[in-house]
């Protein structure tokens, strides 16, 4: 016997429609490339999104057509998010930090029909537009610009396009299982892979991220997604902000610590989301000018492991809760969030800090397990390390344009991470499977060593790689960026680890560099570091730390 309840479709258009109807006056603030701040509201965003959807339809676009964006976090990008997906098309966000060959590849692989771009990225598209045979139109997300038109004849001005739209356009009926948006992985090795999200997966993801034990979002919040909208849809915040009716602050291209500090204070931001390097910049800026935001209550840290020193500084100095989270493109992205349970209330400060270093527990909708190399499930005892597997409502089934059934293993997605899970379900990333150091039969976590290194007052960035070793097969090698004018030595760095890890885990050597190579999403390119420094211990007769 079936239940007798309504079955409404879970679609993206309904999110912005809800925001406009019940939170229409709530502000959406946008920092433009010029630095100018523009102000709108959810009602205006929804109206302009409908007009844009109408205009795209008049251009001949039909459901399931892909529309690419290459743009910063700004209000036009937000309008495109809702216009494209709401009309049944697929919004393909492109990371401009990819190599230009990769940008060409993903546009052609996605078979994008339209590319909408900020003027910042006009030189990139102008260089490659002749190599994009499927693209029928290029839209500059700004007012008409004669210089831009000279670079790319036929360029359409965004405001002109919206002006052609219909004020009375109504969101069409879309099946919740239809594709809504498309993101590509960072392509650390090989070409980027496409992950095609559905309306249903996106709405369910938004519901869960708003829950109290995830990000605890509400209409009273002012949300600042520092994480780019081209990086897994800004971790879903453009959708969850509309769902709860929060004020949304879009920071544009200026993501330095001083700019973010000023924006947080001026707009009363209560929650901000970004990667650790962003928060390092914010903390440095606030320490330098003595500022302290009165509104900020929590920051969400993902993308890479959050150092314990950062958690401590945010909490002890600024009274800000750090929500340590984990996810990936293939998980839309949220897989876990670290919020304490009832029995953690009485823990000591040091015990609470130790708990916060974990990436947290999966919310409803995601299941995790760890397995050994034979696929046997390992115990969730907080000690056993295994390959992390995931499944759930917003977890990938197949990569875009891949052979069906080639992505999963017995219905589970292999994340490529090595992790532990404790009896409460708290998951801790030990390393990427390809990065973990296997030394004399023991596993050494590069993540743990990097977290310790970054806590050193004279180190601003650090990476640890597995360097080949004649006796132990692999040993840890620290590659670090010193703070300006620091006279720190390799020996001093290695000695710094002495009371923090077991002796056999201490890096054999430390090398100082001007900067670490990173990919388009800010992740350190350890493959390049291994290529350059992987044999350095074979050429050295002894460890620097001996």
Curated annotation (Swiss-Prot):
ATP binds at residues 235, 329, 417, 434, 438, 443. It is found in: Cytoplasm. Its main location: cytoplasm. Keywords: ATP-binding, Cytoplasm, Fatty acid metabolism, Ligase, Lipid metabolism, Magnesium, Metal-binding, Nucleotide-binding, Plasmid. One of its GO terms (biological process) is fatty acid metabolic process. Mg(2+) binds at residues 185, 330. This is Medium-chain-fatty-acid--CoA ligase. It comes from Ectopseudomonas oleovorans. The gene is alkK.
């Amino acid at each position: 016997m079936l239940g007798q309840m309504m079955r409404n479709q879970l679609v993206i258009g309904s999110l912005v429609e809800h925001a406009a109807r019940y939170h229409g006056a709530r502000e959406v603030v946008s920092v433009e490339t010029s630095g100018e701040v523009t102000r709108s509201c959810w009602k205006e965003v929804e109206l302009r999104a409908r007009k844009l959807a109408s205009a795209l339809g008049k251009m001949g676009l039909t459901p399931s057509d892909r529309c690419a964006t290459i743009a910063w976090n700004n209000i036009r990008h937000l309008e495109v998010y809702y216009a494209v997906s709401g009309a049944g098309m697929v919004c393909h966000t492109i990371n401009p930090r990819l190599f230009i060959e990769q940008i060409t590849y993903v546009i052609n692989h996605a078979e994008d029909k339209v590319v909408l771009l900020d003027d910042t990225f006009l030189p990139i598209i102008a260089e490659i537009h002749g190599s994009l045979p499927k693209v029928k139109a290029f839209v500059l997300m700004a007012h008409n610009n004669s210089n831009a038109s000279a670079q790319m004849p036929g360029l359409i001005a965004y405001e002109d396009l919206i002006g052609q739209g219909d004020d009375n356009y109504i969101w069409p009926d879309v099946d919740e299982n239809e594709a809504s948006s498309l993101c590509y992985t960072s392509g650390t090795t090989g070409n980027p892979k496409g992950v095609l999200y559905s309306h249903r997966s996106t709405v369910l993801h938004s519901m869960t991220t708003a829950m109290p034990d995830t990000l605890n979002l509400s209409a009273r919040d002012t949300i600042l997604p520092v994480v780019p909208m081209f990086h897994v849809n800004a971790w879903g915040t453009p959708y969850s902000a509309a769902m709860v009716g929060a004020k949304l602050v879009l920071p544009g291209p200026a993501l330095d610590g001083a700019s973010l500090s000023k924006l947080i204070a001026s707009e009363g931001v209560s929650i901000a989301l970004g990667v650790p390097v962003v928060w390092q910049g914010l903390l440095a800026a606030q320490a330098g000018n003595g500022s302290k935001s009165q509104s900020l209550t929590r920051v969400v840290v993902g993308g890479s492991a959050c150092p314990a020193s950062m958690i401590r500084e945010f909490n002890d100095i600024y009274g800000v809760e750090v929500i340590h989270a984990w996810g990936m493109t293939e998980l839309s992205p949220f897989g876990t969030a670290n919020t304490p349970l009832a029995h953690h209330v009485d823990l000591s400060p040091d015990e609470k800090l130790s708990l916060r270093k974990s990436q947290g527990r999966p919310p409803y909708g995601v299941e995790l397990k760890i397995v050994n190399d034979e696929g046997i499930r390992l115990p969730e005892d907080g000690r056993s390390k295994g390959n992390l597997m995931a499944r759930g409502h917003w977890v990938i089934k197949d990569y875009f344009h891949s052979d069906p059934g080639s992505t999963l293993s017995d219905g589970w997605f292999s994340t490529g991470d090595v992790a532990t899970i404790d009896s409460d379900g708290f998951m801790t990333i030990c390393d990427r499977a390809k990065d973990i150091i296997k030394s004399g039969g023991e596993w050494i976590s590069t993540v743990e060593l990097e977290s310790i290194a970054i806590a050193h007052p004279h180190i601003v960035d650090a990476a640890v790689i597995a360097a080949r070793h004649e006796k132990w097969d692999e040993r840890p090698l620290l590659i670090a960026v010193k703070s300006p004018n620091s006279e720190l030595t390799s020996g001093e760095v290695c000695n710094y680890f002495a009371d923090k890890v077991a002796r056999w885990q201490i890096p054999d050597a430390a090398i100082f560099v001007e900067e670490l190579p990173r990919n388009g999403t800010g992740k350190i390119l350890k493959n390049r570091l291994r290529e350059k420094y992987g044999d350095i211990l074979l050429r050295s007769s002894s460890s620097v730390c001996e």
